[in-house]
Amino acid sequence: MVNEEEKDLTAEGDSNNTGVSPDSIKNKTLDFYPKEKTTERKTRSRERISRKEVNLRFKAYLKSRLFRDYAYIIFAAFLGMASYDYFIAATTSNGITPSGIGGVARGIAVGIWPNQDQLQMQTSMYWVFYFVFNIPLFIFGVIKIGIRFSFRTIVYIGLQNGFHFAFAYIPVINPQELFFIVNYNSLNIFSNYGGMYQIWLFVFAAVAGILNGIAYGLVYKGGASTAGTDFVFAYYSAKKKISIANYNRIVNYIIIVVMLAIHTTLLSRSELTSIYFGKYWAANIEQIQRLGFKIDDGGLYDSDFTSHKIKYFFGPALFASYLFVVVQAITIDIIFPKFKYRSLMVITSKADAVVSGLQYVHYPNDIIRLPARD
């Protein structure tokens, strides 16, 4: 009897004579609030976001690291373009040679378009060559260093090209019409032979070095690099765990010397003569001859041609290019110091193991052990 009663009770519980099944309860819970009302509530919630909250979110985004980094990169690209277009390229084919891949790109552009009336084409093609030369280095950077670093670097190079082609064709402010210091291309070289006109070359180099140094410092702060040899040096610096700043500087100096030597070798008689006596030297041949120079309708010749080539190579163009690199490096150190002094205190009961580990990874700085006092 007891078993039968328990079965009846169980059956009663399972039958649920109330007429409300579990499925109907679930459906009623879901359908209790219609979908239209739920959608209206979501819409009202979204509408409650005030304009003040939107502004606060926008300000928070402006302060975010991503926005700051790309702001650095954009401004750096503009300064880099201004440094080259308005100060380096403005010194014409026989002026300042930038360092790194930029020196190679400028050397090729100058070799193909050497005349002063081809300055705009020469400058534009410099940026094209500079971008193309960095493509294989960009691929190297993606493989060996990382996509984030390499992508930001190629963005920097692309923005420089964009700024150049945007400003090159704007009236009044393009580099052919706007001169921040003097119109170097129009200087009367003949009346200043061996004189003060060369001082302007060093002024242009110093200003270009400052602008380019600021650009490099900002692009480093933005988590990118200036491309070119920076990709290779960044890889070996991380791999070998050593500072390669000195090697980088030496390579840049070598590139300047090599490109200037090639340019000097390729100079024709008329081109070399125009460097020292101006582009209208042919109208002043008699005056130049009275000064004792060997010159004819083709330009300087014989020993004067050779001596002036040597003089050109070891002249203002070389030292102005070095000045550009030095000023650029000093400015970079001010904006983005390579070395920051910090003291680290490690409190440990395993001092021997810590010291051995630091020595194993060739930690370059001093390690001072202070015994604990009771």
Swiss-Prot record:
The chain crosses the membrane at residues 70-90, 127-147, 153-173, 199-219, 242-262, 312-332. It is found in: Cell membrane. This is Uncharacterized protein in fibril gene 3'region. GO terms for cellular component: plasma membrane. To M.genitalium MG432 and MG443. Keywords: Cell membrane, Membrane, Transmembrane, Transmembrane helix. It is a multi-pass membrane protein. Residues 25-46 have a biased composition (Basic and acidic residues). InterPro entries: UPF0750_membrane (IPR051461), YitT (IPR003740). It comes from Spiroplasma citri. Residues 1-46 are annotated as: Disordered. Its main location: membrane.
